[in-house]
């Protein structure tokens, strides 16, 4: 028979621990993840941090309740098979599934199309890339066709182009992707802005993955707020050289971790986004009023977190001095160029590429635009 004092001790312990929040995966949905880390490239120097990033992300996602499939150093055939096997796993998990893909390695854009780079890619000319690589759109379309609750794609894939045969023929970084044009319930994150290159980092992990590993561990943090903080953290770590970017068509909230008190909020509908039909000038004016009178550093971090053209335009009008003014103007110019490029690629006619060249006659996309303008 248990002694009364022991019973009292047990009751006290239960009461004490009942008031301590329990950290766990944020909801009861099924969670599956595919983590690809491409380090051992055969035709170009290795990317050691990509493998490190993938291993650390697999650990994080496992602790967040994901059933993780790790797939390192994939050839083209292996990558396609891994995506196919993952799609089957997602489908078998049912419609209440969060499917997440993390990719670390090289990425390329050819003619406005983004490609994930297998370790056996060895192009002799630009035309070899579509034959030897894996289209990002193929991954997105495969996930988009599955009846899932949510699709999350994280790409630490915008490192410099290391292939000599492609020097001067491809655009920098990756092309802009708009999730609103595909399946709803999709979130895609780039490690840097469209048309920009990401850093591999001086430590064991890239600046992007370092920030992801730190920020997402905070309990009850909605995914879109998490990636705003990740953007600011990476921007600070790289002194403005790298700014992560994301596109979202999510219709429900998602949190990597939650306490018991955050469970109900984890499944609540997302608040309505700002009306996209509001004129750009009006959005700029709202940001102008928001930033007015703020210290440059505070205003800079606000617009970096928002990462919208309207926010950058308002900042550029108010703050001209270094270091923040030139950074934002450069970022704004490149963002406008990448939006114009995405529009030209979507229309895909000679007049569309001619219009792009009229605004952007020089730069890393000009050669491809000239080819597009010359098409019959």
Regions found by a protein language model. Name each.
Residues 2-300, 310-327, 368:
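Cysteine endopeptidase catalytic domains of the caspase/legumain-like
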Residues 25-27, 41, 337, 358, ...:
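Compositionally biased low-complexity repeats
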Residues 287, 291, 341, 373-376:
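A compositionally biased, intrinsically disordered/low-complexity signal enriched
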Residues 294-314, 318, 339-355, 359:
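Alpha-helical segment of the N-proximal tetratricopeptide repeat
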Residues 317-336, 362-376:
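Short, charge-rich amphipathic alpha-helical segments embedded
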């Amino acid at each position: 028979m248990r002694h009364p004092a022991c019973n009292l001790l047990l009751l006290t312990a239960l009461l004490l621990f009942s008031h301590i929040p329990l950290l766990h995966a944020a909801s009861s949905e099924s969670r599956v993840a595919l983590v690809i880390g491409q380090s051992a490239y055969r035709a170009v120097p290795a990317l050691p941090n990509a493998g490190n990033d993938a291993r650390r992300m697999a650990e994080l996602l496992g602790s967040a309740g994901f059933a993780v499939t790790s797939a390192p150093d994939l050839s083209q055939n292996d990558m396609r098979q891994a995506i196919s096997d993952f799609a089957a796993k997602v489908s078998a998990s049912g419609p209440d599934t969060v499917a997440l893909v993390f990719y670390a390695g090289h990425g390329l854009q050819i003619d406005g199309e983004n490609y994930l780079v297998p370790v056996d890619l060895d192009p002799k000319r630009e035309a070899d890339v579509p034959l030897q690589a894996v289209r990002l759109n193929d991954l997105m379309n495969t996930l988009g066709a599955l009846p899932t609750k949510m699709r999350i794609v994280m790409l630490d894939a915008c490192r410099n182009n290391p292939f000599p045969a492609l020097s001067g023929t491809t655009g920098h970084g990756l092309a802009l992707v708009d999730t609103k044009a595909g399946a709803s319930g999709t979130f895609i994150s780039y490690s840097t802005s469209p048309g920009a290159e990401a850093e591999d980092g001086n430590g064991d992990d890239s600046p992007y993955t370092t920030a992801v590993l730190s920020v997402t561990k905070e309990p009850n943090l909605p995914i879109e707020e998490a990636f705003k903080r990740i953007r600011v953290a990476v921007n600070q770590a790289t002194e403005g050289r790298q700014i992560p970017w994301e596109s979202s068509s999510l219709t429900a909230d998602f949190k990597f971790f939650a306490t018991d008190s955050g469970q109900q909020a984890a499944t609540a509908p997302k608040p309505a986004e700002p009306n996209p039909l509001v004129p750009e000038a009006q959005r700029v004016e709202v940001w102008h009023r928001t930033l007015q009178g703020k210290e440059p550093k505070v205003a800079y971090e606000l617009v970096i977190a928002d990462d919208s053209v309207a926010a950058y335009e308002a900042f550029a009008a108010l703050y001209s001095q270094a270091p923040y003014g030139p950074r934002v103007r450069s970022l704004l110019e490149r963002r406008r160029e990448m939006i114009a490029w995405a529009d030209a690629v979507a229309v895909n006619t000679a007049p569309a590429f001619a219009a792009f060249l009229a605004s952007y006659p020089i730069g890393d996309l000009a050669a491809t635009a000239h080819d597009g303008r010359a098409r019959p």
